[in-house]
Amino acid sequence: AHWMLGIAFVAVILPLVWLTVRSSPAELGIEAESAGESVSESEELQERYWTIAEILRQRTFWVVVLSFLPLVTAFGSIQQHLRPYAETLGVDSMQTAFLISVFATIMILAKLFFGRMADRFDHRGLFGLSLLACAVAVLGLLTSPTYSMLMVLSGLLGFSAGGFLPLLGAIVASRFGVASFGSVMGLLGPFLAASAFGPMIFSTLFQLHGNYNLALWVALAVLIPGAVAMVFLPKR
């Protein structure tokens, strides 16, 4: 089954990538500017190379860290514990597997949605939408929901998770430019990797209390500083 899924994935994704990805302005029918044309401030930003020290001194960099780290920690922790949480509600393994499928499917669709919307709308509002979906899902999980509601909540978590990479990439590219995109993303990595402690904290709290209630309240509280930090993100 895994081989068949892998082959199907390659058969569908590779042709789409081949047809849609373009590597140069010429392939998109965009003419290169002549040497005499003026360069706007936005274009200068896109071509600027930021040093590591300059990146770390930028308020925007730390706003991104303090905004995305809580969100990734919250939905990542719940994602890792979705199966054992469902088992505490009496959900069997087959039903749990379907919940994970719902999460993954909605996450894929959400990536397309957030990627498209990031080109048109304020990134702060889109981040707020992603964070709100996660917060609503956490509140729902605190109510010991029915299986039908669990499917809805899994979809909300997937929607929230789907906004992570598209919004992170859009914010970095629009605030630091494409020339230093890799440098900024690379520097963000170690800070955002701290979210890996989230599932461990969830496990510890579950072992101490015998349920996920306190862990979920902690996840909800963690989202608050993320929402506050995003307010300070400069407009693009």
Per-region residue spans from a language model:
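Helix-breaking motifs and short loop linkers at transmembrane-helix boundaries and internal kinks
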Residues: D122, T143-P145
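Extracytoplasmic gate region of multi-pass secondary transporters
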Residues: A53-R116, F202
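A late C-terminal transmembrane helix in Major Facilitator Superfamily
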Residues: R175-N211
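Intracellular juxtamembrane helix-capping segments at the cytosolic ends
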Residues: G163-F176
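Flexible cytoplasmic inter-helical loops of multi-pass small-molecule transporters
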Residues: R22-Y49
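Structural signature of the two symmetry-related core transmembrane helices
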Residues: G125-L139
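Paired small-residue
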Residues: S148-L156
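Symmetry-related core transmembrane helices of the 12-TM Major Facilitator Superfamily/SLC fold
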Residues: H2-L19, L216-F232
